[in-house]
Swiss-Prot record:
GO biological process: histidyl-tRNA aminoacylation
EC number: 6.1.1.21
Reaction(s) this enzyme catalyzes, per UniProt: tRNA(His) + L-histidine + ATP = L-histidyl-tRNA(His) + AMP + diphosphate + H(+)
Pfam families: HGTP_anticodon, tRNA-synt_His
Any GO MF annotation of the entry: ATP binding
Assembly and oligomerization: Homodimer.
Protein's name in the database: Histidine--tRNA ligase
Cellular component GO terms, alphabetical: cytoplasm
Gene: hisS
Amino acid sequence: MKLQKPKGTQDILPAESAKWQYVEGFAREIFKRYNYAEVRTPIFEHYEVISRSVGDTTDIVTKEMYDFYDKGDRHITLRPEGTAPVVRAYVENKLFAPEVQKPSKFYYMGPMFRYERPQAGRLRQFHQIGVECFGSSNPATDVETIVMAAHFLKEIGIQGVKLHLNTLGNPESRAAYRQALIDYLTPLKETLSKDSQRRLEENPLRVLDSKEKEDKVAVENAPSILDFLDEESQTHFDAVSQMLENLGVDYIIDTNMVRGLDYYNHTIFEFITEIEGNDLTVCAGGRYDGLVAYFGGPETAGFGFGLGVERLLLILEKQGVALPIENALDVYIAVLGDGANVKALELVQALRQQGFKAERDYLNRKLKAQFKSADVFAAKTLITLGESEVESRQVTVKNNQTREEVQVSLETISQNFSEIFEKLGFYTQ
């Protein structure tokens, strides 16, 4: 049997992982500006953490979760999304305590798992970046979080992004709308897809964002949630809309957007861009004011979003956005002869300890092959070290781009290479 990676997974090799590191680092910098701190939760959780919060009738729970019983007969699941684990951690660690500053702002990054048909930008092990903000029911929190997502997408280079906005109202508004939707869809039940016929019984709002053609036709004239908002829900949505306009953020009200998870209320949103004629959601989220209490904590407002890293990178690639990744070596040492082996090791280590990205030859190759390696590594400078250089303690350092050279001592390289580096036209940070 040929051993290969499981279906729906990928090996992220160095050329690609550099892009991942850039995106993750970029997200960290943006989130830091908004006073978010990182939280890391387990990759697996108790089954109930996900099933009860995400919703027993959602596709995630009924079709897509990787769940199993461990050797202690505990029902475990690999996390399929990030919000429920973060809320569980928030409650379990009593981060709602009075001494903790509010609102509490967290971000997370890491792998998630869903058993679904693998396709471009959608794998069974995928990676998510997300944020969660606890303790503020102020509509300004909704807007700040949406704007932070827009800030990230714009600065990372995603083009043609449109903000789709909707509200699910408070529980009372949602219940009234749910019944209106049942009344509207029940006579059309036989025209719905099999999945939506089931959803009509269990969670009729999910029929609205079905991708099946027959379902799209059925909901064309469905009642709008906006007609069922009570005063509280309408006031919240109006405030969010007005603040977005005040900040110059364009949006589209999309009343068929409901999101795939059951815990949302009030504001929900998606950032969508078009790739090769298809609409792709690049980031999505919303408000979930009941989730902390559901996990046994006090009544606490919550708002957050998540985005898939694989899909983000796919969109950047399709849009021709080149990430500014710096892979070049600062120094490459070509080694000539056994007599230079020890000194080359000392020298490359001294350079690294000064903060330079440095490499040397270990394979006793001909100089031509070593110079080729220096070019492959895009080395900025090149040092050739042979036995004669070791004896004289003088070497030539070459700018590998302009071919300019300087003659310096080994001691100078070991102690103050930045002076040589700058002399050859490069700048140290």
